[in-house]
Each structure stands twice: as C-alpha cells, then as structure tokens.
Amino acid sequence: MALNDWLDWGDWKGIRGEEMAAFCASLIWWIAALVVLSQCIRMVSSRQTGPILNDKGATIVKEQKRNMFLRLPIILTAVAVLGLCAVVRVADVGHQFGRQLSSYTATTTTSSNDAQFTVAMDSDVGADLIPNIFDPEAVDPQSVCPGYTASNVQETSHGFTADLDLAGKACNVYGNEIEALKLVVEYQAADRLHVEILPRHIGKDNYTWFILPEGLIPKPQNDGKTQSAGSESDLEFKWANAPTFGFNVTRKSTGDVLFTTVGTKLVFEDQFFEFASPLPKNYNLYGLGEVIHGFRLNRNLTRTIYAADIGDPIDGNIYGSHPIYLDTRYYKADSDSDELIYVAEPTDKTASYKSFTHGVFMRNAHGQEILLRESNITWRALGGTIDLYFYAGPTADSVITSYQKSAVGLPAMQQYWTLGFHQCRWGYTSWDSLQEVIDDFAKFEIPLETIWADIDYMNQYRDFENDKNSWTYEDGEKFLDKLHKNGQHFVPIVDSAIYSPNPDKKDDAYPTYDRGLSSDAFVLNPDGSLYVGAVWPGYTVFPDWVGAVLGKSKTFAWWKTELETWFKKVAFDGIWIDMSEVASFCVGSCGSKNLTQNPAHVPFQLPGEPGNEDYSYPEGFEKTNATEAASISALSSSAEAAKSTAVNDAETTSTTTSYLRTTPTPGVRNVNHPPYVIDHIHGDLAVHAVSPNATHHGGSEEYDFHNLFGHQILNATYHALLSVFPGKRPFIIGRSTFAGSGKWAGHWGGDNYSLWAYMFFSIPQALSFSIFGFPMFGVDTCGFAGNADMELCARWMQLSAFFPFYRNHNAIAGIPQEPYRWSAVADASKKAMAIRYALLPYMYTAFYRAHTLGDTVMKALVWEFADEPWLADADRQFLLGPAVLVTPCLVQGATTVDGVFPGVGKGTVWYDWYNQSAITGVTSGQNVTIDAPLGHIPVYLRGGYVIPTQEPGKTMEQSRANRGALGCA
C-alpha cells in the first residue's frame, strides 16, 4: 500500500494482516523513540553540574545515580523495541503497500519439501538455432525450387481435381521434395471455397506426416445446398500454368482478387511447404494467433504458430494455434459507373465507403510461420497439407459465423454463474486462506461468485491429490459445503503432466499414475519406453491424447475416471487446465534414468524463493509512490547485482555462436531439428516442451501433433465433466487451444504482467479470440507477474468488468491484489461490478446467440460499423454485445480518455449509462475527450436496442432472484 494511501483514513478499512503489523511497527517505533528521548532529557536535566553545598549532598548524588539506573532499563527496553521495529520495517519495506511474500512463499516449501534432487539447470537448454528469416545463410525457396505444373483436370459435382507434377529438378531445400501432388477444389457452400493440395501417394508409414486425421480435427463438409460448382458462390477459383502452377481466388461482386499465387512458385516437401500471395496497399488483416499484439496486424511482421509455455511476450508465439485471418478492404463507388474501386487510404470522413471482409483458414496442425510484408503474405509450415478454406463474408461477423458453423463448431454455452466475478492467486495456502478471502469480500461488500485454487492445494504438485496438511479432504468438504450453501463456486487447477513415482520409495505410490499406466495412457519414447519429462512435481509422464484416437490408448476413459474419483473427494464446479502446450522443463526424456531421484525440484527457482523475489511495479509507479519506489529500487538493485555476479561467474569467454543447421536426408525426417527453423520463442522445438520425436501409441510422432495437446485435453475434460455433472454444461478454462477448442472451453490470456501495456493488450487479445470462436475470454485482471498498484488495479478491475470472463489472479511472488486491498480499488470495482451484474441478462443473451448462431460477445467497433474505415485499427474501445460501448482509461495518471462514437454520421445515437443523456454535437470519426476520473469507466448504450437488466446482487443466485427490467435506448 502506498504511503499516501496509509495517510488516507478511508483506506484503513482495507488494512489487514501484515499491513496492520507494519503500521503498528511504525507506531511503536515512534513511541519508543519518544520514550528514549524523554528519559535522556530527564537524566541530563536532573544531573548536578555545580558543587554540592549542603550536608545532604551525598544523598542527592546517590539519588541521582539511583534515578539514572532506574531509567536505564526503560531506555534499553525502548532501544530494543526500536531495533525490533526497525527489523520489522526493513524486512517489510514492501509491506507499506501490502507485500506478503513470506506467507505466500511458504507454499513453495510445503509442496516440495520432500525434494531430494534438483533437475539440472541446463537440462532445458536446447541447440543453438537461428530462425530462417534471420539467417544470412538461408536459401530462398523461390530462387531454387522449380514449382509444379497442373494437368489431368477432372470435374466433380462441386468443383474439380487436378494433378500437380514437379516442373523441374527437385530442390530439396528444407525437406524431401514431393514430386506428385493432387489439387482438390470444392465449392462447399455459397460463401465457402475449399482448396487442398496434398501428395498423390501417401502410405501408412507417412500418413500423419501430411494428413490431419478428422478424428482429431473435423474437416468442413459440403453443406448440401450448393447445386453446381461455383454458380451460387461469390468466390471464383481460376488456375494457370504461367509458367508454373498458380491460382486466383476472386470475389465476383467486386472483381477483386482476394488471393493469388500466380507469379510465385509452390514449394512442397515432407518437412516444409511455402506459397505466397500479394496483398493490397495498406491492407487490414486480423487474427493469426495466439500472440500479444495490437488488433490489426502490422504490415511487417512474422506470425509463428507453435504452442509455447511462455509468459506472454509481445509479438512472440504463445499458447494457442489459430491459423485464420480476416482481410477487410474498403471501396468507393465510381461516380460514373458505380463500379467499386479499392481505396488504400480512406481518410475522408465525409465520404461514403463500402467494406468487404473475407477470411482464410489453414487447417494444419504443424508448426507454421506466416510472413506479412508490406505488399504480400507468405505461408510456410513444417509439414501437413495445404488445406485452405476461403470465406466470402462479406462482413467480419458473417465470416466468423461461417467459420464456426463449418470448421470449428459453435462456442460452448456457459452456465449463468460463470459470468460472475472470480478470485484466484498462486499463493492461497489452505482452505482457511480461501475462506478468509471469501469473508473479506463479504466484509467489504464486493461481489464474489467463484474462488479458485492454484497448484498450492496439490500434494507435492500432483494432479488429483490434495495436500495432506493444509488442504485435507475433510476440511475441504466442510469448506465446499458452506461455499455452495452460500450460492458460490469453486474451481481448481489441473495440470497436464502426471507425476511418475519413485520406484525405490514404497510411500511414493501414486494411483493416478498406476491407472494411467495400465491404460496405456502415456506418451512414449521412440523405443517404446515411457517418455519422462519434468514439470512441477518433478519427473513426469504425459497423457497420450493422439494415441487414444489413432492407437489403442484408453487415455480418455482414464482421464474421466480420475476426474470422477477426485470429484467424490473435492466437489469442484469447474476445471482450470494449465501447462497444456504441453510444457516440460527439460529437453527430451530427461527423467528416464532419474526416477529414483523423484520427487525432484524444477530446474529453476520458483517465484518468491530466495533470490527470485519480484520487485517490478507498473509504469509510473515511481512518480505516484516515490518513497516506496526508492526502497524497492534499492532491494531490486541488490538482487540484480547478486544475479549478475552469478551470471558473470558462469559466463564463458566465447563471443561467437555456432548455429546448428541441418539438411534433408532422403526418406528420413529430422523432427527434432527440422532443416527449416521457424521463429519459435524458445528456439529449439524441444525446449520447454515434449520433444518432437516423442511417440504416440499407434506410431505417430509429437512433431505432427504438438499443437493439438491443449485441444485434446480440453476435449477429454469436457466429455469427462458431462459424466461428473449429468445434465449440466461443463465450465472449463484452458490455456493451450487450437481451432475448435472454443466448443468445449473458454480461455484466459495466460501469464501477463502488472503493467499498463498489458492491460491495453487484453483488448486486442480478446477481440482476436472472438474471431477464433472463444466468447468466454478474459485475462488475469491486475496482472499475473509483477506487483500491481492501486491505480492500475482500479482501472483494470473496471475494464475487466466488461470482459466475458472476469477473474483477478496473480503470482506467488507478487503482493496481494484482491480488490479490497485498496479502498479506491474496492470502490471502483463495486461501481463497475454493479453495471456488469445489472447487464447479466443481456450478456447471457449474447452468449446464447454465440452458442446458437455463431455470433460474437465481445466485438470490435469495426465489425458493427463496417463502413467506417477509421475504425479499422480501433482497439482501445470495444462493444459488449451490439449495444454496450466501453471506453476504458488505459493510461497511468490520466483523468480523461479519448474515444469515438461510431455510427453517429448515419443516425446512431449513444446514451450515457450513468445519466441516460444522449451524446450530441459529435461528428463521424471524431475523437472526443471524455471525463474518466479514477473510479469511473465511461459506458454508453446504443439507441434502438432493448437491453434486459436485473438488480445486482453479491452472487448470481441473489441476482437472479432480484427483479428484472427492460431498458430501451
């Protein structure tokens, strides 16, 4: 808590625990100091400095000495108190503003205190690789590969097929060239065109090198309504050998070429393919995730699609794989011919524009790289087929709807209670600590729907087992019974790796592992032995979801059994799936020969452990909290100096790097180090992940299915929960996702940071996941890593109140950030929550439309107001449903915010939520400065809509019992 907050008497109601102890220490210090000072003054003033003039002089001297000796214990005691309080204050520099590191770090030791061995720190170090796009020695496939020529065209009922044959000598630049390909073109629906290029000859041994099995990812099918090839479609496919094979996809209504490979060469090898298309000047592309980035994609970037366990780097590949983009183009009608003409710079806000949006989806699960440059797009992948789906639109909403209905499935419908507020942190140490948080929410009258538990609850970080001391099943039953009677809910985390017990320790038995082993439920090494990596519990094995579909593994049945068995002990209400990229903290099967060392400590310091404290704070903290910032800076500098010394001691004198480069071998794939190196955030594909050569039951390799682990664990969890909760909709939040995961689960944005920049990035991330088919999306409000401060947390709690999934969560090394920790945050939260809870019937309706129609819940302004090109990159505002406009303050220290009121030039009227007044005097595209003092978030209602509301309560159960109303704007 900041010093100025301590002086705010209104904030005293939020002080608890160590915060009060810190304050009391300060108070006692000053009292003790005054005692010492007063006693010293009395001693000095009572001493006789002149000669003794009477016969009682000896008695007076004795009395003075006696008084001095009487005061001496008082002084010494006061000095001791001074020292003790000083120690408390020094040890608690951060406690002025709520730091509680010691209490949360304790969970690290309670869960890992049996560790005998630490996995080597260098065990997660891979080969030195340089991404192809940065490699000066890299070969450009377009300059050396021959391309293909098309022949043997065969008409089909909805399109045609053709043979593609290599047009010259194989280049074998990043794999072994496939000489004979097949082209399949199919008009699947009036708004959807399918283009697939695959090898003509595929055997059982290399089937999964190229074919993505429909048992894992369903393939969009012909809708049965299209009568003849292309006659009803606004899309047209044409091809030519000019001189090598290329194709065009054109929009008939505008004559615009949406995608063309003509003039470039198709490259197709067993570990690499490439095709390219020009893009119009100043193009507007969206999607291609998962990545932390602005909503509209820059015109000079590379998008890598490869699931990675990493803490939200900007512009790096992270957890999910979503190879789809939207392309929006703006046109003006020619005054003479009414012909639509593309406009590269639609800046005239008085002009009338018409937009068209199309979508492109690549059904491919391999590692991919999409190069966006100033005037073209190049698509590369490490395997699979070119399996493209073009969506005609012509609006973003219609593309998203068609994509969901045809390719990935309609989003999961959520239970009503899931729309309430969720509280979590890594560092809640017991059932009692959860109850304390719940009680504090009630004390400060802040709504709380769901309390979550991170890995703290686990017995030595093992799935489906509770800690035997602080999280007993008996105490949990009492806690959950009370929680559920109060209409509240509980969601625990479940990680994706399974502890492998120490064979030399009889007391290390783990029934979950034993049942999985008997079900052939775990991923293997190429030699058939168990693949053993390392995650939180130590050395671990990994569920084989692919083997359950393509082999004889009983992984799904085993997973169902584990959830059902655990539910009988812990009556959870939903499941949080984490680490599902899938993460492993060592390269390769590092635990195969080390199981007798289990349970082992991970090869790095856990957050909050000595030497790994977190002293980071939001941008601007040093201005608004100068005293605390200075103390933190000193501690941080000391810690960094220690780290720097350790690093310098370990450094070698080498100043050059020798990169590993591999070349293709005929008939053999190098899956661990493919010849083409994608720009992967971890470099080596085996770093922080299961190695690409890990083998699934049935013989397929992880290389071909890495991006699907998170998708399939959500599939398994969803269907298991249908059994756990008969007749109820499963509630699941997952980290790693793939195209289609949204039909089973929601998603949170992962391990973000307590920074203003990340609060902003949460908006484009949410809008991107609307494209991907995930209406249930939110982020770690107030930030996961680092330390939030009052202003950031207040603004973020306001912003997230209008996200579909609303949860506050942070890491074990950070200060507590529950909204009641600061009075200003509590007030801002309650005000924003009151609006959210009032709008819950409206939000629930939006979810129903998403689930049944493929609509979006959180919307970009440009989707609703498609013909206003100045909204093309608007990502600091958004719409909740079609009728609620949110304009959050995203800048530290600001008390106003700039925003636009879309549609005002065409008759749209906006009304202030707070006073119901209409916004007037605003022109189309005008940036308006809006008052946004701390505690206020501007919210507006769109005219012409009827909005269902209800009186807000502290829980969904209370809210639904309150009276409802209809608001007409």
Predicted regions and their residues:
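Transmembrane alpha-helices of multi-pass eukaryotic membrane proteins
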Residues: R16-I28, L70-T77, L708, L792
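N-terminal signal peptide
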Residues: A2, S38-R42, A80-E137, Q142
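A low-complexity, Ser/Thr/Gly/Pro-enriched, surface-exposed linker/loop concept
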Residues: L129-L164, E177-G230
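Short, low-complexity, Lys/Arg-enriched N-terminal segments of secretory-pathway carbohydrate enzymes
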Residues: M1-R16, A21-L27, I31-N67
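C-terminal low-complexity, glycine/proline- and small-hydrophobic-enriched intrinsically disordered tails
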Residues: L941-A969
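Extracellular/lumenal N-termini and interhelical loops of multi-pass eukaryotic membrane proteins
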Residues: M1-D8, F97, L101, T109-T110, ...
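Hydrophobic or amphipathic alpha-helical targeting/insertion segments
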Residues: G230-F268
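Catalytic-domain carbohydrate-binding cleft regions of carbohydrate-active enzymes
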Residues: F117-G159, G255-I937, L941-R942, Q950, ...
